Amino acid sequence: MAKLSKENLLLLFTVLGVVVGIGLGFSLRDPSKAWSKRHLSYLRFPGDLFVQMLKMLILPMIMSSIITSLASLDSGTAGRLGMVSMIYYTLTTFFAVFLGIVLVSVIKPGKWTTTNIEDLVGHVKTTPCVATAVDTIIDLMKSCFPENLIEATFRSQKICLKFFNGTTEIPPEIAMTMSPEQRAQFTEVPEKIVSDGMNILGLVVFSVALGIVIGVIGEDGKPMKNFFKSLEACSMKLIGWVIIYSPVGITFLIAAQIVGMKDPGQELHRLMGYVITVILGLLIHAFVVIPLLCVVLARRNPIKFVGGMAQALLTALATSSSSATLPLSIKCCEENNKVDPRVTRFVLPLGATINMDGTALYEAVAAIYISQCYGNDLSLGEVVLVSLTATLASIGAAGIPQAGIVTMIMVLIAIGLPTNLFILIFPVDFMLDRLRTTVNVHGDSIATAVIERLCEDQLQKGGHHLDTNDQGYSMLSTNASPDPKRITIGNNCENSHML
């Protein structure tokens, strides 16, 4: 009862933090005088600390949890988990894209705007990287196998295209405004760009391989398995401490974002049709499609399940980062919704990297909306191209704030539009980014229940459940109880097993 009260109290403070952050943000806004970046950084400082503490724990948590989970399974069970996860994630992403295309084609929000596109394009601050869909696929495959594992913990690579007129390089800001036909007149040279940021996909692939190998070699792998079990327990305990600070961090993150907006009302009015379309799509996917999958495939009560994920969803809303929310997602799935830790610690890190339903839906809507604003009606083939490219772009999107605006450039290239037209939607991206991140985290969490149900037989045959006291399952709570609990998967009381 004391544990339940403490968890409810933390959730209450998290909700209160959201409300206080909104109120504080609007009360500190001064329409006549904008805040300087320095002053905004001061206001955002407590929130930045919260996000950085979460990100600090991502690396040890991801590697230790995946390795420990898969080391407890036989190779057949691990393979089944991976195959089912990939199929499920791909299908839900495709459906999200399809839903977005249907809504934007019916509502036609691009016809609502009176925006002067030429004025916007002329004042855009461009992104100095142009890449095609093929380049992105190649980047994705290469990211799975980093040549230097240590470098992958803090640096990632991608391919950017540079254009030359003879020996003279075309400035990236000019290349971005050109159509594919115009770019074809110049020499195209792909170049590898190294950027700061963890290569999570590469670390996940390595951890999966290492975990399977540790399980295969048996007794010889026990020292490694015990090491990662201890590392996981420590990571989870640290996460539990960081989460206590979450209401404070969330308050100042939201307040700083609101204070930094130039004119929320004017920007929202200009993009009203687009915002309505995206939000409607996200609501349908989050409250109809995903809960339906939860009922039909997982045989769980979606309302109760979402209630157990409330704290993670609020954190996703505040941080707009599925990667930063990952530690809390694992905690909520395991402690509140009683999902098998072997599933959560494999499925959630993978989902935070490649399962971006909300991002995929947003990219499909945004690309067609921009095309409508530009006066370009897409053909059926171009719509199909948008769906495929949006799916690939969402898979390649990093779980960081506003990663979707970067992958949007790839979708615009695919349909032949100037890439700097993303400025049309940029003013409201901060808000939609938080909503689509919340949908991403929501979809990942439901995926754990679905995959647990679909792989139930293999999980029962593939090895014992994780020892929650050794591995930190209970360590997420500051006053965890060592007593095991018997739970059931779905509504099947005959298939109960120990956690």
From Swiss-Prot:
Any one Gene Ontology BP term: L-glutamate transmembrane transport
Keywords of the record: Amino-acid transport, Cell membrane, Chloride, Glycoprotein, Membrane, Metal-binding, Potassium, Sodium, Symport, Transmembrane, Transmembrane helix, Transport
Binding positions for Na(+) 1 per the UniProt entry: G351, N355, N440, D444
TM helices/strands, residue ranges: 8-28, 50-70, 87-107, 194-217, 227-254, 276-297, 343-369, 430-451
Gene3D superfamilies: Sodium:dicarboxylate symporter
Positions of Na(+) 2 binding: T353
Gene Ontology terms for molecular function: glutamate:sodium symporter activity; L-glutamate transmembrane transporter activity; metal ion binding; neutral L-amino acid transmembrane transporter activity
Cytoplasmic side: 1-7
Membrane topology per record: Multi-pass membrane protein
InterPro entries referenced in this protein's UniProt entry, alphabetically: DAACS, Na-dicarboxylate_symporter, Na-dicarboxylate_symporter_CS, Na:dicarbo_symporter_sf
The organism's place on the tree of life at top rank: Eukaryota
Domain notes for this protein: Contains eight transmembrane regions plus two helical hairpins that dip into the membrane. These helical hairpin structures play an important role in the transport process. The first enters the membrane from the cytoplasmic side, the second one from the extracellular side. During the transport cycle, the regions involved in amino acid transport, and especially the helical hairpins, move vertically by about 15-18 Angstroms, alternating between exposure to the aqueous phase and reinsertion in the lipid bilayer. In contrast, the regions involved in trimerization do not move.
Family stated for the protein in its record: Belongs to the dicarboxylate/amino acid:cation symporter (DAACS) (TC 2.A.23) family.
Role description: Sodium-dependent, high-affinity amino acid transporter that mediates the uptake of L-glutamate and also L-aspartate and D-aspartate. Functions as a symporter that transports one amino acid molecule together with two or three Na(+) ions and one proton, in parallel with the counter-transport of one K(+) ion. Mediates Cl(-) flux that is not coupled to amino acid transport; this avoids the accumulation of negative charges due to aspartate and Na(+) symport.
Protein name according to UniProt: Putative sodium-dependent excitatory amino acid transporter glt-4
Organism: Caenorhabditis elegans
Record lineage: Eukaryota, Metazoa, Ecdysozoa, Nematoda, Chromadorea
